[in-house]
Amino acid sequence: MAAEITSTDYIAHHLTNWTYGYLPGEGWKVAHTAKEAGEMGFMAIHLDSMLWSIGLGIVFCALFWLVAKKATAGVPGKLQAAIEMIVEFVDTNVRDSYNGTSKLIAPLALTIFVWIFLMNLMDLMPIDYIPVLAQKVGAAMGHDPHHVFFKIVPTTDPNITLGMSFSVFALIIYYSIKEKGLGGFVGELTLHPFSAKNPIAKIILIPINFILEFVTLIAKPISLGLRLFGNMYAGELIFVLIALMPFWIQWALSVPWAIFHILIITLQAFVFMMLTIVYLSLASQTEH
């Protein structure tokens, strides 16, 4: 594939999603080029990201369900032992970092950690295998293979990472209102960090406090999602650049980078999970 097109085309092809959306003048369709995908705008759907994220979510649920169903009280098998270690690891972090009373946080944290880890893990797949297979399938169906895009790492798509982070943001708002009441939540946004005993001064400070607190609040999901996206996108881009090099250089660079990347994909899943726990813990605290 790399020999048939330019390096620029190769990189652009690997960084373009399989996109379905409304193209002005042509109606609803699958994008044939990166330019068409961009012109489809915000409402376009990245079909590959949806397919892989949902598919890996099903794999996660099925795997844990099967292990739980076959779990024994005696000496556990290797898979059961690994699952138990993950569950205990997440549960320990929740107990140490979450000060609220909700029983939802531990299973939520476990879901976030394992799901993101599985999505990140796709970055270790050989860069061309699945996309080239998708191109061959597309060609067999009568499509131009160069117009077939198929990314396999959902966390390199900001729509996925920001979608997860804003779901966490919705939980932050929910727990803030649940624990503090609507009045307490509004007061937290308008009466801090600056306060005054004089009623007039307090009213004057309300918009200033709101701007500062709102920026702090909205920065949480944005930074949470973009941090995961940025790290994974950069990792994928490096793999793409390595794939453009001569074969003997590819092995010399890809193996150590893949080994190092194992740390990155695990760390990014852990960071997302921990920040979620911390944010929800702060939202559950009744004192500012």
From Swiss-Prot:
Keyword Transmembrane: yes
InterPro entries, per database record: ATP_syn_F0_a_bact/chloroplast, ATP_synth_F0_asu, ATP_synth_F0_asu_AS, F0_ATP_A_sf
Domain of life of the organism encoding this protein: Bacteria
Membrane topology: Multi-pass membrane protein
A single BP term in Gene Ontology: proton motive force-driven plasma membrane ATP synthesis
Ranges annotated as spanning the membrane: 47-67, 104-124, 157-177, 199-219, 237-257, 258-278
Cell compartments where the protein resides: Cell inner membrane
Keywords for the protein's UniProt record, in alphabetical order: ATP synthesis, Cell inner membrane, Cell membrane, CF(0), Hydrogen ion transport, Ion transport, Membrane, Transmembrane, Transmembrane helix, Transport
Keyword Ion transport listed: yes
GO MF, any single term: proton-transporting ATP synthase activity, rotational mechanism
GO cellular component entries: plasma membrane; proton-transporting ATP synthase complex
Oligomer status and interactors: F-type ATPases have 2 components, CF(1) - the catalytic core - and CF(0) - the membrane proton channel. CF(1) has five subunits: alpha(3), beta(3), gamma(1), delta(1), epsilon(1). CF(0) has three main subunits: a(1), b(2) and c(9-12). The alpha and beta chains form an alternating ring which encloses part of the gamma chain. CF(1) is attached to CF(0) by a central stalk formed by the gamma and epsilon chains, while a peripheral stalk is formed by the delta and b chains.
Family per similarity comment: Belongs to the ATPase A chain family.
Protein name stated in the entry: ATP synthase subunit a
Organism per entry: Psychrobacter sp. (strain PRwf-1)
